[in-house]
């Protein structure tokens, strides 16, 4: 009962603050403050893939809206996506550099599309997913893991030039995009090969022993 109650409150907290802005429906972190901004982690990665399970159509619409905002920043030069799209969609924040934001969006958009099960929406999201995966591929370092300026903690703690979180998100995005692309009839064999190689590289680069336990660092 305690866990059920906690989860019930979490569902309310996760869905209570969605604002109808001039940039469309935008999900906020909860509470009573008007917060017309979206993040590659808070919305694209965390809450959006959950909304289809909640069955809350306003949440689903806000999720699609957020991905459409990030899709505006795809570019042929493969410059980083902004970390946050603010002020009802008319400005951005990228104060921590590349936090692995493309990996966050690729993971979240793939998971959202799989969970929602709407083919038309999935087709709309597919170019964004492809772009984000290609961005990550282009930013692999010599060890075959994704390089970035920071992680989601934005340098509150040292993250080095490559971090486990970003490469793990990219790995899951490759797997999830493979499932999604298969349903959509897209060529996805390369994603499976890239995921296999990335898994080995993650183990080599981040694997370690901490206090006698085989883990990651």
Which residues does each PLM region occupy?
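Substrate-binding groove/exosite segments of carbohydrate-active enzymes
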Residues: 1-123, 215-217
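Extended, well-ordered alpha-helical scaffold segments
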Residues: 5-9, 58-71, 118-136, 177, ...
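Conserved helix-loop functional segments at active or binding sites
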Residues: 16-20, 72, 76, 111-114, ...
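Aromatic side chains
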Residues: 34-35, 112, 126, 135, ...
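Short, glycine/acidic-rich beta->alpha junctions
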Residues: 41-42, 128, 162
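Short alpha-helical basic/polar micro-motif
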Residues: 44, 127, 168
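Catalytic cores of carbohydrate-active enzymes
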Residues: 81, 141-152, 156-217
């Amino acid at each position: 009962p305690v866990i059920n109650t906690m989860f019930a409150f979490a569902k309310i907290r996760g869905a209570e603050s969605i604002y109808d802005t001039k940039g469309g429906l935008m999900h906020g972190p909860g509470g009573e403050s008007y917060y017309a901004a979206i993040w590659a982690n808070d919305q694209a990665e965390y809450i959006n893939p959950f909304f289809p399970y909640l069955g809350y159509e306003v949440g689903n619409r806000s999720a699609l809206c957020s991905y459409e905002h990030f899709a505006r920043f795809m570019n042929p030069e493969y410059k980083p996506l902004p970390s946050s799209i603010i002020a009802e969609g008319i400005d951005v924040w990228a104060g921590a550099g590349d936090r692995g934001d493309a990996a966050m969006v690729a993971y979240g958009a793939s998971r959202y599309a799989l969970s929602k099960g709407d083919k038309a929406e999935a087709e709309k999201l597919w170019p964004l997913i492809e772009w984000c995966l290609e961005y990550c591929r282009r930013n692999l370092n010599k060890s075959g893991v994704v390089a970035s300026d920071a992680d989601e903690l934005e340098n509150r703690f040292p993250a080095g030039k490559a971090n486990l979180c970003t490469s793990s998100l990219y790995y899951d995005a490759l797997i999830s995009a493979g499932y999604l692309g298969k349903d959509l009839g897209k060529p996805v064999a390369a994603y499976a090969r890239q995921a296999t190689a990335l898994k080995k590289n993650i183990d080599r680069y981040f694997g370690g022993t901490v206090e006698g336990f085989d883990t990651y660092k």
